[in-house]
């Protein structure tokens, strides 16, 4: 088993979004797989369309878990912390 590079932190908003995703019966294992890759410092597959955000979310990154299910996260390099900020649809996060 690979050792993680980053300590994973969850925001209160992410915890709430995670519970909402569970209630919607979204495939949580896909989210967990992405979190695992990020925690190990591995690049995400191209299908996840990982990219930097701008505007209010500058300093954060976004990737697609599914076409309209996103994960917003931030990597704080100095302290090696992966902060999971939000998860949800485009409309929920940016609408």
What are these regions (language model features)?
Residues 1-67, 76-82, 87, 91-95:
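Basic, Lys/Arg-enriched alpha-helical interface segments
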């Amino acid at each position: 088993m690979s050792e993680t590079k980053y300590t994973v932190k969850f925001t209160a908003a992410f915890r709430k979004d995670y519970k909402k995703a569970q209630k919607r019966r979204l495939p949580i294992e896909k989210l967990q797989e992405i979190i695992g890759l990020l925690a190990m410092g591995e690049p995400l597959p191209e299908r996840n369309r990982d990219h930097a955000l701008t505007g209010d979310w500058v300093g954060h990154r976004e990737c697609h878990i599914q076409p309209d299910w996103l994960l917003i996260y931030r990597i704080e390099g100095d302290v090696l912390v992966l902060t999971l900020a939000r998860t949800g649809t485009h409309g929920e996060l940016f609408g």
